[in-house]
Amino acid sequence: MVCYPTFGGSGVVATELGMALARAGHEVHFITYSQPVRLALLEKNIYYHEVDVPEYPLFKHQPYDLALSSKLVDTIKGYKIEVLHVHYAIPHAYAGYMAKMMLKEEGIIIPMITTLHGTDITLVGSHPFYKTAVTFSINKSDIVTAVSENLKDTTFEMFEVDREIEVVPNFIDAAKYAEMQNQPCDRNLMALKEEFIITHVSNFRPVKRIKDVILVFKQILDKHPAVLVMVGEGPDRIKAERLSKELGIYSKVKFLGNSVEIDRVLCMSDLFLLPSDQESFGLAALEAMINKTPVISSNAGGLPEVNIHGLSGYVAEIGDVEKMGQYALDILKDSETLNRFKENARKAALEFDLPKILPLYVSIYEKAYKARKQNSEL
């Protein structure tokens, strides 16, 4: 399992997938430059291999893809790994292909599954400097998956892909959240009894439209007592703090920074705001929904596939903060409506429960391994 070890969606999904596979009895090896943030190393069947990138003054930028491909070769040979699953096209699929070619020289055939997560296609991959390499890496993968129908369509539109892309959506482990819901949510830690708790979780990059989050919250605050809980760090945090001060609502906005206790925040939330310019899937929305938190989102990317309009929340055009504010007020207008949306949000999230999605990946691994055996016998 090759992934980024950070708080980003692709790394979280890869880590959760690997741990679920390990619990199901499969041996899983994580190969990345630092330990993934959600990886539990003490669980059975889980191994972590750090990619060390030596510092050489000759290089202006250290060649991580070269170090990764070499580490892949050594690990695959040393542990007799049978399937390689890379998350995020650049540089992981590219390094994976180079490792495949080096192994092939030694008579070792290993299939590579590449999962596309979003910004590897829409932002990084579309850059002219990377587009050729991304196209090559996708086409040289044995199996390609995307986390939403929208991302699949976007990939075909932006790249000259000559192979099938299977859609395997991101997932949530409902059992884990069921255990948490038996524990009390201390709303008094965040808000007064009469205040609604509105939440946003992201990396605070421009694509997340943090300004829109503040503007939608201002509309809510004009009608109801409320607080806004902002979880995450990124370049637009300072702008968000400045805007909330200009609007006179800074005392009602709580900036928590990066947190490993996101679920504790979501379990006490009444509404989740996600007005992004682009979301290939919307994992943050799904995590809110499983915690019975309805979502107000834009219609960007794969969000409408996750946040069902009128059921788990509402979907509006990108940038239409007035409509988002109206939708938010509609959900918060009375306790009966709010509770209905809360229950429906969880029901919608259960469509992405881990027991439904994990067999899809296992089936893909089996298909790739079977094809590899056939190819090695030719």
Where are these regions (language model features)?
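A short helix/loop element that forms part of the nucleotide-sugar donor recognition site in Leloir-type
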Residues: 178-192
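Conserved donor-binding/catalytic core segment of Leloir-type glycosyltransferases
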Residues: 145, 191-217, 229
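Conserved acidic donor-binding segment of nucleotide-sugar-dependent glycosyltransferases
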Residues: 309-310, 314-321, 330-335, 350
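Nucleotide-activated donor-binding/catalytic signature segment of Leloir-type glycosyltransferases, i.e.
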Residues: 241-257
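Aromatic "clamp/platform" in nucleotide-sugar-dependent glycosyltransferases that forms part
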Residues: 258, 277
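Short hydrophobic beta-strand element within catalytic cores of glycosyltransferases
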Residues: 294-297, 307
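N-terminal strand-loop element at the rim of the active site
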Residues: 3-7, 19-66
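Carbohydrate-associated surface elements
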Residues: 150, 171
